[in-house]
């Protein structure tokens, strides 16, 4: 019995690693491609694409970390004999949702665009609507594979989908801008990249599915039939809870898409407001890059924690939860503090100028809060508490909408950045409060002061370094900004890691579970033995 549990745990962690790797690669690509895209189309073109990106992103997330998680959870909750019924009912359920969302977006494109304050966006919204016709099939197949702990097809399809999406987006936008096409046409072409990526992902998943189908036949005559009513209830519940929680970052972006331009422009068409919204949207790739590891870890936590709860391994579950939250806190704090200190050269390096640096520094605080919010939500979901994280997301979206309305008319994009940080902080605070009520945060108290101290020391070093650089090299071109930014990242990262190692924030076991952690541990032990 113990051996079978051990083997199962091994397969779960091996599969989780595959999905973590795929998630890291796809999220890095999702953040990085926006830099050359902004360089191609400019701030106004970036604004146009970002207005419809939340719709595209929602379709991608539903087919990647929303419904696949739900389907795999259902397959793990019920015996293998019920898997065929689960997949059949899920297929019908997802198809209905996909058609409904498509019709709402496609038929409502003009009213939505008018609500946003830019009627030219209607065509782009209609293009984005087609993504919801493809997502049900992609989500179903990914969920089926993940429910059988076969992570390779899901991971491979994710990476291929993202590579193709980026290639089509950049290629078409570059070609159209070079030809002199309008930025709205380039934006619509860029949005079509998501459709191409989803179609190829579906082909890859279909190939693996039909290839393995014969090896996974079950005896349906002895099938323990689950009622349609029972499964539909669970699908509806999980759709509102798990899916809503996974869409936190996109919902916050959706609020900005719906009301930020209108608030900046005062309800009138304004090129300046479009440019400001595009500058503000520079913060999105920074947020994604800064939180990519925490978000990827959070996604992989759900099936493991569910298995630990199912096997009543509560001590192991609590240890893994503590380690994951600690890692999230460290990565989020370091990324937020470091980026705030070097934001000006990073802004010039990535986006060609330093416009909006102050607003983006405020926005950078969101990295820590978003990382904590997503990771804490995943922990709660894995432990079976799926409703509360969804409520927290709803509260965060409400905070964002209200603060945008109050702050943007007075403070512009700085107010929008503050509203974003506050909304993520609200979600993180609610989820962490719930974890505290479960007594799962006790071991984190002792590491807060060392982490804050490490971040403050790193910030002091970075601020001194950037001032020294400005004094020695007054040039403000993009080439100088690249050298300053990359060298500052190396220096700040080294200082932060060294402080954490010296203060013993992580145990040897925790270090051995992260990339290069064991080498860092050995390096620090050698220094201590040599009197360093």
Swiss-Prot record:
Family to which this protein belongs: Belongs to the polysaccharide synthase family.
Q: Where are the transmembrane segments?
A: 25-45, 65-85, 109-129, 134-154, 179-199, 203-223, 248-268, 302-322, 344-364, 371-391, 392-412, 425-445, 459-479, 494-514
PANTHER family cross-referenced by the UniProt entry? POLYSACCHARIDE BIOSYNTHESIS PROTEIN C-TERMINAL DOMAIN-CONTAINING PROTEIN, PST FAMILY PREDICTED COLANIC ACID TRANSPORTER
Q: Which InterPro entries match?
A: PG_synth_SpoVB, Poly_Biosynth_Transport, Polysacc_synth
Q: What is this protein called?
A: Uncharacterized membrane protein YabM
Keyword check for Transmembrane helix: yes
Annotated Gene Ontology cellular component terms: plasma membrane
Q: Where does it localize?
A: Cell membrane
A Pfam family recorded for this sequence: Polysacc_synt
Q: What is the membrane topology noted in the UniProt record heading this document?
A: Multi-pass membrane protein
Keywords, sorted A to Z: Cell membrane, Membrane, Transmembrane, Transmembrane helix
Say which domain of life the source belongs to. Answer: Bacteria
